[in-house]
């Protein structure tokens, strides 16, 4: 496994306290605000005209919730991320043609949101473990490009 037993413990320990629905909406919203070019995949989502509009957009929140619930399911299969994300990789890569760089950006935004929510608890060791996880997930999602 790309994570040690200790790292898995840190990731699962923090993740058990995450409000997945709320954090998902915030992470996707921040992605669209911070990296505005990612908005082109969400043109059907309505008003994305300002940071406030994006962060309060119900469709953004709903998709963010969906995204993070999938991420959460993936954590249960941490030793087979490629398998866990095969279908989503196919959808995003083959059908939607999402640039895989966007998966990496969202992973980094998620790390920021977790740091923001958990403060001191999100210490350097926890961050290091989560960076490995989001990199692993991004790589699994980009798998169809290789």
Swiss-Prot record:
Signal peptide: none annotated. The modification Phosphoserine is found at residues 44, 50. The modification Asymmetric dimethylarginine is found at residue 104. InterPro entries: Globin, Globin-like_sf, Globin/Proto, Hemoglobin_b, Hemoglobin_oxygen_transport. Red blood cells. The modification N6-succinyllysine is found at residues 17, 59. PROSITE patterns: GLOBIN. The modification N-acetylserine is found at residue 1. GO terms for molecular function: haptoglobin binding; heme binding; hemoglobin alpha binding; metal ion binding; organic acid binding; oxygen binding; oxygen carrier activity; peroxidase activity. Keywords: Acetylation, Heme, Iron, Metal-binding, Methylation, Oxygen transport, Phosphoprotein, Transport. Heme b binds at residues 63, 92. It comes from the Eukaryota. One of its GO terms (cellular component) is haptoglobin-hemoglobin complex. Residues 2-146 form the Globin domain. Gene3D superfamilies: Globins. One of its GO terms (biological process) is hydrogen peroxide catabolic process. In the cat family (felidae), the oxygen affinity of hemoglobin depends little or not at all on the association with diphosphoglycerate (DPG). Belongs to the globin family. Heterotetramer of two alpha chains and two beta chains. Involved in oxygen transport from the lung to the various peripheral tissues. This is Hemoglobin subunit beta-1.
